[in-house]
């Protein structure tokens, strides 16, 4: 019986992927105005379907709460009228971005007279595998559509009802613009085997993008025959150098940890130069503790904070290198900049790293030597975001160096081909 079910699921996923492949072919040369019209119509459909979408989301949230998920997880899953309006606004924003398809990125003429151009083209079919983030369903569908790609969307089971309701609104936009319904498809089953069946279809799917925790990333990378571009965890560090201005240190630590702790560019570890720890740690620690952050400290940091009357607890062995996604922060005192660089090299996840310093030489060395998709100097880790960096909307933040590194916007959802023109040239 299990084998029959598996064969049925495999056939279902192949049929779904084949429809996506056909849609991708049509999207590769679709009129940009038609794609933009679909996005705007989808935004309007979300507004009209608000009651239905929020009702389905409430069912998802209730089930996740009953399953014992934590507050940060529930926050990522939850939709409300304001967040839904933000999703619709993002569709209008994406519609207003420049279409990357067909953009000439370079051109030259060879001595033999050949005219050569490099132009952007869609990747094809993109499989997006993600956890309980309903907004990703729409963001990924929209960015793939704008860049001429078909999207197969595989949300976590906790967000399936919400995602199907949002996808129905998106499908309405596609229909109104006369684009293929299979341009954006949500995998309709919570069965994990469906993901594995899709990951085997390297003849139909061009790229898989897993976005979530370590177990999700590992499962996709280990089982996939499709090229994988990882959007891995964000173990983001904030290093306070010896010359860090105390108030700036407080502001950046608070913003990085407290503003939205459940996202991948939140600060997860605070490193402090030993020579300034006595001056910097008490005000920074007090501000964080007052904001409800649990400080998990190495012995030196713990002693300094306890002496200053700031609530803190000893760090556990695995707290360094951990993505908490909650109001928890690992804290360590390091000898100097070398110590900070060594710590980040060992525990960082190639996502975002930040330094607070007045010393230009320290800032430049930090920028040179830290291996991450974004390196911040006197700025919060929260700025590693497509919109904040001026790239427009993003499908996620890649921690894989091939084919894109950092926020993935429209350009990163394309590849390039050569167009060569001659006059009967032979070699």
Curated annotation (Swiss-Prot):
Keyword NADP: yes
CDD domains, sorted: ALDH_F18-19_ProA-GPR
Gene3D superfamilies named among the record's database cross-references: Aldehyde Dehydrogenase, Chain A, domain 1, Aldehyde Dehydrogenase, Chain A, domain 2
EC number: 1.2.1.41
Catalytic activity: L-glutamate 5-semialdehyde + phosphate + NADP(+) = L-glutamyl 5-phosphate + NADPH + H(+)
Compartment(s): Cytoplasm
GO MF term set: glutamate-5-semialdehyde dehydrogenase activity; NADP binding
PROSITE patterns, per the entry: PROA
A Pfam family the protein falls into: Aldedh
Cross-referenced HAMAP family: ProA
Record-given protein name: Gamma-glutamyl phosphate reductase
Any one Gene Ontology BP term: L-proline biosynthetic process
Pathway(s) annotated for this protein in UniProt: Amino-acid biosynthesis; L-proline biosynthesis; L-glutamate 5-semialdehyde from L-glutamate: step 2/2
Cellular component terms (Gene Ontology): cytoplasm
NCBIfam families, A to Z: PRK00197.1 (NF001221), proA (TIGR00407)
Top-rank lineage group of the source organism: Bacteria
Upper lineage: Bacteria, Pseudomonadati, Myxococcota, Myxococcia, Myxococcales
First-tier enzyme category under EC: oxidoreductase
Biological function: Catalyzes the NADPH-dependent reduction of L-glutamate 5-phosphate into L-glutamate 5-semialdehyde and phosphate. The product spontaneously undergoes cyclization to form 1-pyrroline-5-carboxylate.
Similarity comment: Belongs to the gamma-glutamyl phosphate reductase family.
């Amino acid at each position: 019986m299990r084998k029959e079910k598996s064969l049925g699921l495999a056939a279902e996923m192949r049929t779904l992927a084949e429809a996506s492949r056909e849609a991708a072919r049509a999207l590769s040369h679709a009129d940009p105005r038609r794609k933009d019209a679909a996005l705007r119509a989808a935004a309007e459909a979300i507004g009209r379907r608000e009651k239905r979408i929020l009702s389905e989301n409430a069912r998802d949230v209730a089930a996740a709460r009953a399953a014992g998920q934590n507050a940060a997880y529930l926050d990522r899953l939850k939709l409300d009228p304001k967040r839904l309006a933000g999703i619709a606004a993002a569709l209008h924003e994406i519609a207003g971005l420049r279409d990357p398809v067909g953009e000439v990125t370079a051109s030259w003429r060879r001595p033999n007279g050949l005219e050569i151009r490099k132009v952007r083209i869609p990747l094809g079919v993109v499989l997006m595998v993600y956890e309980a983030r309903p907004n990703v369903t729409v963001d990924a569908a929209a960015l793939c559509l704008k860049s001429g790609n078909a999207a197969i969307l595989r949300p976590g089971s906790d967000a399936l009802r919400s995602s199907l309701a949002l996808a129905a609104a998106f499908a309405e936009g596609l229909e109104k613009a006369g684009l293929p319904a299979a341009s954006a498809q949500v995998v309709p089953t919570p069965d994990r085997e469906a993901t594995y069946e899709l990951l085997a279809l390297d003849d139909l799917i061009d790229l898989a993008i897993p976005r979530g925790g370590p177990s999700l990333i590992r499962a996709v990378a280990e089982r996939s025959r499709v090229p994988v571009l990882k959007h891995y965890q964000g173990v983001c560090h904030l290093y306070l150098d010896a010359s860090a201005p105390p108030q700036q240190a407080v502001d950046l630590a608070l913003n990085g940890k407290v503003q939205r702790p459940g996202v991948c560019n939140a600060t997860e570890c605070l490193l402090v130069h030993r020579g300034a720890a006595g001056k910097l740690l008490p005000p920074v620690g007090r501000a964080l503790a007052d904001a409800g952050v649990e400080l998990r400290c190495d012995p030196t940091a713990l002693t300094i904070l306890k002496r200053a009357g700031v609530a803190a607890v000893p760090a556990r062995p695995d707290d360094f290198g951990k993505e908490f996604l909650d109001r928890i922060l690992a804290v360590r005192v390091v000898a100097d900049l070398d110590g900070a660089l060594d710590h980040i090299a060992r525990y960082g996840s190639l996502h975002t790293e930040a330094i607070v310093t007045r010393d230009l030489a320290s800032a430049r060395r930090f920028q040179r030597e830290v291996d991450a998709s974004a390196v911040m100097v006197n700025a919060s880790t929260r700025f590693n975001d497509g919109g904040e960096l001026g790239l427009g909307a993003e499908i996620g933040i890649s921690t894989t160096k091939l084919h894109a590194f950092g926020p993935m916007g429209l350009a990163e959802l394309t590849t390039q081909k050569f167009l060569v023109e001659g006059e009967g040239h032979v070699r």
